[in-house]
């Protein structure tokens, strides 16, 4: 099903009016798909990838040669110790320690250090392709637990995805999506999203892909053009940054 738009963040009780938004439901559905695919990719993704090391090294560029990572770590322990050493040094430099780059470096290096410790990788030779899947095949108990946790989250996301239907938010006569549905009054909004350049674009794409609405819905979405500095541009539904 769909989530309501407003909840009390203290007890998660629904707030009035009990309203279902077409845009927010479509966005949430898209996030679930992204989450599921991301979780699936984690299983065979490197535990410590070359890309992640390059990213955190980039955060140290303002430091020049003062704090930097080596290029030739032999073991995971060497990497973890160096990350700890650099993070500690950054914390002792007030001018840089409070910067976004320093905070991001300390946070990301902490994640890598925790993974190395949790998966008991310390004495292993550093391998940029070592994945959770590889560790599971070796019988690593922490990797087995992590894969099981990922599977549970993936199953939850899949269940939530399969439970969503956009048919109830679709105006069958106009072949367009309503703005939303007010459960409290059991009424639809009178207006519909009728332009391609609108916040509901993702909802339209996903609903068509799911088979909840006909492909003809796409043709019903208007595509008015205007000139901006002499160049043609789409006119959006309400002119917001969301579009």
Label the model's feature ranges.
Residues 1-243:
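Acidic, mature catalytic/reactive cores of soluble proteins
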